[in-house]
Amino acid sequence: MPHFHYSLTDEQAAELVFKKYGVRITPEQIAKAYAPEQRMSWKKSVEVARFIKGMTLKQAKAWLEDVVKLKRPIPIKTFKKKQAHHATPWEGWPVAKWPVKVAKRYLQLLENLENNAKFKGLDVERLVIIHAAAHKGIKIPNIMPRAFGRATPFNEETVNVEIVAAELPKEVVPKRYKLNLVKR
């Protein structure tokens, strides 16, 4: 079985929880999931990872299921050049999208995270996503034949996705996810 290198160690995750929530946890209260070399958009993966960070596991799964059903979008904060900006669209974001393929892959990863947490004996209702990251993976080389015997490189990008969740005490677990609305 390959050994994956997470960008966050258990000690760093415990320190991150203490800084944000003021609670000391042990490495046994941390669950991780990693999906290497996923064939999906890196930019959309970064936006989804940024959005689900801070949610409980149940909240993130519910939101991403709504994205797959095209009911609720994901806000786009970084990669928004040449995208449609709306006056007051979905709950105050000027740019939002429905990255269905990315949401399906993240749902599979969240399912993996939930199973890892159950295996460690953690309470799934109290799991909060404290770290989510998407890193560029390898490029799968490909070529597109062109006219007059030419060829153009047509590479496929891959993404390495990691999610870290921590089991927090009930009084610290966020009841409802607060959305960061854009002030105009």
Swiss-Prot record:
Keywords: Ribonucleoprotein, Ribosomal protein, RNA-binding, rRNA-binding
SUPFAM superfamilies: Ribosomal protein L22
Coiled coil found in the keyword field: no
GO MF entries: rRNA binding; structural constituent of ribosome
GO biological process: cytoplasmic translation
Record keyword rRNA processing present: no
One cellular component (GO) term of this entry: cytosolic large ribosomal subunit
Pfam families: Ribosomal_L22
Family, similarity comment: Belongs to the universal ribosomal protein uL22 family.
Description of how the protein assembles with itself and partners: Part of the 50S ribosomal subunit.
PANTHER family: 60S RIBOSOMAL PROTEIN L17
The protein's role, per its UniProt record: This protein binds specifically to 23S rRNA. It makes multiple contacts with different domains of the 23S rRNA in the assembled 50S subunit and ribosome. The globular domain of the protein is located near the polypeptide exit tunnel on the outside of the subunit, while an extended beta-hairpin is found that lines the wall of the exit tunnel in the center of the 70S ribosome.
NCBIfam families xref list: PRK04223.1 (NF003260), uL22_arch_euk (TIGR01038)
Designated name of the protein: Large ribosomal subunit protein uL22
Organism: Pyrobaculum calidifontis (strain DSM 21063 / JCM 11548 / VA1)
